[in-house]
Amino acid sequence: MQNSEENKRRGGSRGFSFFARNEDGMRRVEKEEIQRVIVQREAKSYKGDFGRLLLIGGTYPYGGAIIMAALAAVHSGAGLVTVATNPDNLTALHSHLPEAMGFDLADHQLLCEQIQKAGVILVGPGLKEARENHAILNMIFEQVSSQQVLILDGGAISLFAASQFDLPEAQLVFTPHQKEWEKLSGLDLASQTEGKSRRAVQNFPQGTVIVEKGPHTRIWTSGQDEGYQLDVGGPYQATGGMGDTLAGMIAGFAGQFPQVGLYERVAVATYLHSAIAEDLSKEAYVVLPTTISKEIPKWMKKWSDNLNENVENETFS
């Protein structure tokens, strides 16, 4: 991968000290730690306190991807969500999610304005690998700052891996599935072991968060040797849009919960995504991503109110 030496100077997120180890030596999320992230909202707060998000993607024929990401972001509590997408998707977006704003991705002037306003930018769900999108990714890289969170998912990962771009001075999150991780790390599927992935993560700018999606999803950050591995989730999640929904949840959490670091927010969002799916699988052969999104507010309410005793222990331990 390509990055500048300047990127290496950026400080990483603080240690995720409130995780317990599993049998493989990786760490796992404990109930108490989820409650440290998902806290009750202050009485005197407004939508601007909970993240201004810009989601970019949904080029033809992948309009559903960006809509599912937006659904997850809004249901995760994001304060303001704006979607830059193919104009053919806007009617469907507003039909499914009137809470979100949307505009034509081809309107580069408006896109630039929205990039400057956003605190969290998610690019990639349903983003086709095309020349015009290569230019859009370059535009984003040139404009984002160290104060912004930039999440690269799906098509944005492939576009970046095929480019010669230097990574920007933003707070970076990558959410690759196994083939996308191969493009980023150079590790084929058989080589994506715990140890080799750990070493590959260190090639990214310090503080970069990597969600290495797979049968046993791992979460890493550059600058720390230890990673975290999910012990929830399963094959009932193997359906289109699951990763888009996860990316939207991560974006939603990234815009909130300043009492903990970005790494913590990403890890808990990733965990909650699979924990909800596991619970739903008790009554469903396949769990749809949009069904997960509908459940997010209920689960966040339980955690923030310390009511998780109503949820079966095995779902979260």
State what each model feature region is.
Residues Q2-V149, S158-A170, Q178, E182-S317:
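Small-residue (G/A/S/T)-rich helix-start motifs and N-terminal tracts that mark the onset
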